[in-house]
Design a protein with these regions (language model features):
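A cytosolic-side transmembrane-helix exit/cap motif
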Residues: 52-56, 145-151, 175-184
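Residue-level signal for pocket-adjacent positions within structured domains
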Residues: 47, 57, 230, 271-273, ...
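FNR/FR-type flavoprotein reductase catalytic core
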Residues: 3-13, 65-175, 241, 250-409
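Ferredoxin-reductase
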Residues: 180-268, 310, 317-319, 330, ...
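Extended boundary segments
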Residues: 19-26, 113, 156-181, 209-230
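Long, contiguous hydrophobic alpha-helical segments, chiefly transmembrane helices and signal peptides
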Residues: 39, 44-45, 56-57, 62, ...
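Membrane-anchoring hydrophobic segments
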Residues: 1-79
Length: 409
């Protein structure tokens, strides 16, 4: 399990919190104490920290556990009064701060689940009230406990440590991330519409973007009428200070981008993310792309004109009008005998099928495309070879939270 370090971080934090409250003889405060710790971890997991991304083996796993700790925190807060046994320690102000914090958290959870019905920018700002609720919760805890949490005991150190993590992480996310993380400034040099719904952007950056074939990055677009929030797009190539992104019209933002993006527009880019690294597979590889899922494979093809390994590439699409880069793929196959190209138009030959495919243990299968398609193909591969080396990713916005589905089987 590649995310074992990240899981261990959460588990150790929970166990340490339980032990700290129990050793202080305050077992009835364990549940609210755990809520503060898991809320701190919720903020920490939203920072997109590079080390944490490695520990969780991908930002997609970080978002999964971010959601888990957030929901777990709300459940703990809902049980707060029960765990306290109805005791009313501290001042009336402390109790009111705690109530306000809980109401805010519950409201924000409801907003998160209704997120698909409101604009992303509005959802994003509403979600920031979590930080305010967290501060109310900390004031509630410290006012309630008097000086117990301010002494250099195990309990005071543990609660203070996670409080600092939560406060610093939340402050960074809300006030610093947008300005500090997007260090790669650039300008759109070329807008190329590949078909009726897919556009390719060629961007010149002020400094080189370090990335690996198969990764994606968050991009901010500074053009009137566009959201200021960053959006994730797959990298489709680049060298030196040039980087390419290929984007499909699949929502409000990408539709506007396809219709109205202009050459000369300024952009800023965060670092590269993702763990579907084509260079990390075995010598023999099978690549499977569905629709816009071709993008990460194009990044490899563009920057490696001479293929030095056997690759069977299956590109699935529905109608030639929806396909992209067909000429590039055909030219690449003509120049590289080891590149076995299969173009699969579902209108002509039906959907891609790998039932009874003889997959050996010396081959890595990389897949990128619709999640349902990849899950189906993965099941087919595993039926013939339970030890199949499969790596697949698919990007979506789940309730406007960027989620990367990444599986290493």
């Amino acid at each position: 399990m590649k995310s074992i370090k990240g899981i261990a971080l959460i588990a150790v934090s929970i166990l340490l919190t339980i032990y700290a409250w129990a050793s202080a003889g305050m077992t009835n405060f364990i549940v609210p104490g755990l809520a503060l710790t898991t809320l701190s971890l919720t903020f920490l997991l939203a920072t997109r920290n590079a080390l944490l991304e490695k520990w969780f083996h991908g930002i997609e796993k970080m978002y999964t556990y971010h959601k888990f700790t957030a929901i777990f925190s709300v459940v703990l807060l809902a049980l707060h009064n029960v765990a306290m046994g109805g005791s009313l320690w501290g001042s009336h102000v402390a109790a009111q701060l705690g109530n306000v914090g809980i109401y805010l958290f519950v409201s924000i959870v409801l907003v998160a689940y209704l997120g698909k019905h409101i604009k992303y920018e509005a959802w994003r700002w509403i979600h920031r009230f979590v930080y305010l609720a967290y501060i109310f919760g900390l004031f509630h805890a410290y006012m309630l406990m008097g000086g117990r949490l301010l002494t250099p005991t195990l309990l005071g150190i543990v609660v203070g440590f996670y409080a600092i993590i939560g406060l610093v992480s939340g402050f960074y996310i809300i006030f610093l991330y947008q300005s500090l993380a997007f260090r790669h400034l650039g300008k759109i040099m070329q807008v190329k519409r590949l078909n009726h719904d897919t556009v390719e952007l060629k961007i010149q950056l002020s400094q080189k973007l370090d990335y690996q074939y198969g990764q994606f990055a968050f991009v901010k677009i500074f053009q009137e009428g566009f959201e200021k929030a960053p959006h994730p797009f797959s990298i489709s190539g680049g060298h030196d200070n040039i980087v390419y992104f290929t984007i499909k019209n699949s929502g409000d933002h990408t539709k506007k981008l396809y219709d109205k993006i202009q050459e000369g527009t300024k952009v800023s880019i965060d670092r590269a993310y993702g763990h579907m690294i084509l260079d990390q597979g075995q010598e023999k590889q099978i690549w499977i792309a569905g629709g816009i899922g071709i993008t990460p494979f194009i990044s490899y093809i563009r920057e490696n004109p001479n293929l030095n390994r056997p690759v069977s590439f299956y590109y699935a699409y529905t109608g030639a009008e929806n396909a992209v880069y067909l000429d590039l793929l055909k030219d690449y196959a003509a120049k590289n005998p080891q590149f076995d190209l299969h173009l699969v138009d579902s209108k002509v030959s039906g959907y891609l099928d790998f039932k009874n495919y003889p997959l050996d243990n010396q081959t890595t299968v990389f897949m990128c495309g619709p999640v349902k398609m990849m899950d189906k193909l993965a099941d087919e591969f595993k039926k013939t070879n339970p030890k199949a080396d499969l790596v697949y990713e698919g990007f979506k916005f789940g309730n406007y939270i960027p989620v990367y589905t990444n599986h290493k089987v």
